[in-house]
Amino acid sequence: KEVDATKPVSENARKNEKTMEEWNYLRSVYGKQVITCQQMMDSEAYEDLVFYNASGDLTAMKGFDFIFSTGSYTSDDMIDMAIEWSKTSGGLCAFTWHWNVPKDIDNPSGGYAFYTSEITNFSQINAVTPGTKEYETVIHDIDLIATKIQRMESEGVTILFRPLHEAGNAWFWWGLQGRDSATNEVFQKLWYMIYDRLENYHKLSNIIWVWNGQNPHTAIHPNSYDIAGIDRYYDNEDTSAEAITKYYTSCYSELQGFEKYCAEVAGIEETGKMLTLSECGYMPDPEGIRANNTMWLYYMIWNGDFIYEPGGGGSPLLDLDSTPSPNPKRLSNEMIQNYFGNDLFVTLNKLPEFSFGGRDIPQKIKNWEFYKNGG
């Protein structure tokens, strides 16, 4: 079938009015503005307090994770947070999946992991081979994730879903097998398994698909994803806006290159897909984006001390009002004010009023304001 980047690849999504409302918004801003996003760590939401304290505003989108939806320890906290964010504040939701599987498929009580280095006996090849224990685990987990997405669907929440992220590297178990091969058929099979199971078996209508393979060997057909993303973390002593802009500009070109391989799968010149900086460690400079025409659909800065000043043990350094400060190595209040105030960036306050969500600030922010003001 013809590749049409102006419509969601999901036939089910095209029939969901709320999903199409969000889709049409994404298409309308792409190439004109960039949506701000941050990855959430937990319900404490200290990252929110950093941005709100500096600007009175929040990112337009938040990133969540199905990391606790499978494995030995399970929790629906991330699902609850996403639903509240969408319905209370009208914010957009992105989901990735740090997919925990048994470290040893023959010993499920031996713990779960998603890092390749921690897994001793879970074959990626078996994961896409019917009749194996790994295959049964994979199908079980996909079906479990489907129940979480179905719950959000029933609440009117659309998600930008980014499974099998950073697959071009070997640090996650779903990463490349046989890097020197022309294609990595195992990855492609796993991607299509997830897509087919959620689209055709569960018939979910609230998914906008994000491919984040970021390697020629993970190229997939463009009719199985809507957005192409790249995760890149700048790591250099020169942290000037100019240096970071130069780095992100090269990342944009790199992603365009990856997209050409997906176009080749379909036998076309280009996919026309929207491009995103799906993970990063520094907020990009809006003026740098404008000057270099690297118009990401959105950028998503990671959580924790990528945003707040660390205080030890993974927690932020708090003042007497329990307010975290920006990590001075990466952010400042002035930078947040300037970037959020730039008309290129879409923040929560700049989003339109969607039919699926409210316009209230999160309860965590209200509680913080109450105590800060002596309540």
Where are these regions (language model features)?
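Acidic (Asp/Glu)-rich catalytic clusters
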Residues: 27-28, 49-57, 77-90, 149-156, ...
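Alpha-helical scaffolding within the catalytic cores
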Residues: 21, 43-51, 77-80, 144-147, ...
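Substrate-binding cleft of extracellular glycoside hydrolase catalytic domains
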Residues: 71-193, 200, 204
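Loop/turn elements at helix/coil->beta-strand transitions in domains of secreted/extracellular proteins
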Residues: 31-35, 57-60, 88-93, 154-160, ...
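Aromatic-lined carbohydrate-recognition surfaces of secreted/lumenal glycan-active proteins
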Residues: 35-39, 162-164, 191-217, 270-283
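Substrate-binding cleft of secreted/luminal carbohydrate-active enzymes
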Residues: 30-41, 271-374
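Boundary/entry segment of secreted carbohydrate-active catalytic domains
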Residues: 2-53, 58-65, 365-371
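Aromatic- and acid-rich polysaccharide-binding/catalytic face
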Residues: 62, 215-249, 301-303
